[in-house]
């Protein structure tokens, strides 16, 4: 049940008509990329960073330069699974007063660019907003679904029910430490794609692509026909090409945020984001025909009771992008 605060916030967010991407999900994007013999490029930024309009302009630049799917981060005051780069951006957004209704407005704006928009959020803000209200308002805004990295498989039943009723993708995470039974349960609960967080530790750009990423993708594909997208801190085109050679999707977040943090001003930062997106897109497209094994058509894989956390059965807390 939605809380009064969530209901009030939701009423503000649902004004207007749904964006063009409403309930479209990510399946079509993966299918088109697979037909082209390449992986999908997924880009993340927190809503409201570097500013309310600046984030929308940055998303636009990313899509224009070749990002296929956008992750709109919902800022949260306790981002324990994120590294210092993303935490700095999230702090900036929160200081600017960005809240869930603003994230939904950002999703509406981004969906107009033609790329599916997923909300990346810790579970607490969604629960406080109201699970059904959030699903309804996200669909109305044109959102494709949500990635919920800290939502455990045992506690996600309400979210799965609400998301399914609004035809939203539900993306959960697997990690190298996840045992086979956990990977299977997570995969049966995903719709759209499976997020493979292949590097232990908090988020952040990495200097090299390890073998664990490819092994995790292979293990995950033993349990699902859904596409498998990898987040491990990719920071350049060469790394994107490496990951695209074995995964259905390449997820990049910290590197985009770093470009904005390091820029002398917002306009320069957006240009840097666009340049990075173009470099990453070229890398992804340079691995044509290599990203096989996943069913890039997407869809729902089975009917598990709930989605899962990346860590499955271990005690670490991490999400990599």
Regions inferred by a protein language model and the residue ranges of each:
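Catalytic cores of alpha/beta
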Residues: 53-62, 178-188, 230, 234-250
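Active-site beta->alpha loop and helix N-cap motifs at the rims of alpha/beta catalytic domains
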Residues: 69, 74, 87-150, 284
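Active-site-adjacent beta->alpha loops and helix N-cap segments on the catalytic face
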Residues: 22-33, 52, 77-86, 95-105, ...
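N-terminal amphipathic alpha-helix/helix-capping segment at the start of soluble metabolic enzymes
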Residues: 1-44, 107-108, 288, 320
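Alpha/beta catalytic cores of nucleotide-metabolism and tRNA/nucleoside-modifying enzymes
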Residues: 1-3, 218-226, 235-245, 249-293, ...
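Glycine-rich phosphate-binding active-site loops on the catalytic face of alpha/beta enzymes
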Residues: 69-77, 143-147, 152-155, 194-204, ...
């Amino acid at each position: 049940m939605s809380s009064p605060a969530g209901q009030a916030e939701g009423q503000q967010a649902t004004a207007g008509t749904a964006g063009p991407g409403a309930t479209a999900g990510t399946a079509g994007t993966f299918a088109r990329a697979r037909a082209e013999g390449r992986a999908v490029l997924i880009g993340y930024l927190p809503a409201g960073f570097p500013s309310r309009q600046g984030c929308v302009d940055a998303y636009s630049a990313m899509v224009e330069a070749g990002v296929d799917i956008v992750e709109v981060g919902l800022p949260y005051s306790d981002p324990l699974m994120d590294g210092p780069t993303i935490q700095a951006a999230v702090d900036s957004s929160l200081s600017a007063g960005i809240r869930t209704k603003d994230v939904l407005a950002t999703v509406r704006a981004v969906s107009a660019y033609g790329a599916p928009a997923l909300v990346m959020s810790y579970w607490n803000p969604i629960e406080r907003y109201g699970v059904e209200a959030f699903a309804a308002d996200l669909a109305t805004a044109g959102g494709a679904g949500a990635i919920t990295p800290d939502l455990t498989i045992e506690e996600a039943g309400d979210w799965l029910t609400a998301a399914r009723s609004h035809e939203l993708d539900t993306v959960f995470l697997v990690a190298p430490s996840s045992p086979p039974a956990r990977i299977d349960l997570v995969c049966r609960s995903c719709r759209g794609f499976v997020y493979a967080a292949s590097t232990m530790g908090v988020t952040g750009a990495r200097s090299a692509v390890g073998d664990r990423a490819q092994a995790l993708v292979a293990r995950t594909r033993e349990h699902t026909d859904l596409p498998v997208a990898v987040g491990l801190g990719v920071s350049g085109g060469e790394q994107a090409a490496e990951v695209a050679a074995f995964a259905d999707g390449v997820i990049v977040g910290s590197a985009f945020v770093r470009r904005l943090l390091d820029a002398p001003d917002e306009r320069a930062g957006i240009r840097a984001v666009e340049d990075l997106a173009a470099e990453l897109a070229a890398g992804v497209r340079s691995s044509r025909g290599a990203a096989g094994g996943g069913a890039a058509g997407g869809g729902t894989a089975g009917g598990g009771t709930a989605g899962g956390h990346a860590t499955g059965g271990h005690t670490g807390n991490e999400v990599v992008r």
